[in-house]
Curated annotation (Swiss-Prot):
It comes from the Bacteria. It comes from Salmonella typhimurium (strain 14028s / SGSC 2262). Disruption phenotype: Deleting the operon causes 50% reduction in persister cell formation in mouse bone marrow-derived macrophages. All 3 tacA-tacT operons can be deleted without an effect on growth in cell culture. One of its GO terms (biological process) is regulation of DNA-templated transcription. Antitoxin component of a type II toxin-antitoxin (TA) system. Counteracts the toxic effect of cognate toxin TacT3, but not TacT1 or TacT2. Plays a role in persister cell formation. The TacA3-TacT3 complex both represses and derepresses expression of its own operon. The hexameric 4:2 TacA3-TacT3 complex binds promoter DNA and represses its transcription; both subunits are required. The octomeric 4:4 TacA3-TacT3 complex derepresses the operon. The shift from hexameric to octomeric complex probably alters DNA-binding, leading to dissociation from the operator DNA and derepression. Does not bind the promoter of the TacA1-TacT1 operon. Induction: TacA3-TacT3 autorepresses its transcription at low TacT3 concentrations, at higher TacT3 levels it derepresses transcription. The tacA3-tacT3 operon is up-regulated 5-fold in a relA-spoT-dependent manner within 30 minutes of phagocytosis by mouse bone marrow-derived macrophages. GO terms for molecular function: DNA binding. Residues 61-96 are annotated as: Neutralization domain. Transmembrane segments: none annotated. Keywords: DNA-binding, Repressor, Toxin-antitoxin system, Transcription, Transcription regulation. Forms a complex with cognate toxin TacT3. Forms a 4:2 antitoxin:toxin complex with cognate toxin TacT3. Forms a 4:4 antitoxin:toxin complex with promoter DNA, where 2 TacT3 dimers bridge 2 TacA3 dimers. Only TacA3 contacts promoter DNA. The neutralization domain (ND) is sufficient to counteract the toxic effect of its cognate toxin, although other regions also play a role. Belongs to the TacA antitoxin family. This is Antitoxin TacA3.
Length: 96
């Protein structure tokens, strides 16, 4: 299973980017056209994209066959085996 890369996040709310001169000119121009400052322009346009990427990475897609199999197991769970029973009885009693 792939692990997600860990990104160090500083405690401040600043984000520094290096872009080409042409890219910066285009971004500044687009922000001006929308009559917004550079920060608001970048944040308002990147947040939906970032959310879409995170949602896609964290969502599980199942085939119809997989869905039916899971529903069948939930509706008719198998009997617990010896290892599961032993593990359950080894747990501390949480009743108080």
């Amino acid at each position: 299973m792939k692990t997600m890369p860990q990104i160090a996040i500083e405690s401040n709310e600043r984000l520094s980017l290096r872009v080409s001169t042409d890219a910066k000119k285009l971004i500044v121009r687009a922000a001006a056209i929308q009559q917004t400052n550079l920060t608001d322009f970048v944040v308002s346009n990147i947040l939906p994209v970032a959310q879409k990427i995170v949602d896609a990475a964290e969502r599980v897609y199942l085939t119809e066959r997989d869905t039916k199999m899971i529903m069948e197991i939930l509706d008719n769970p198998p009997a617990p085996n010896e290892k599961l029973l032993a593990a359950a009885f080894a747990l501390p009693d949480m009743k108080k």
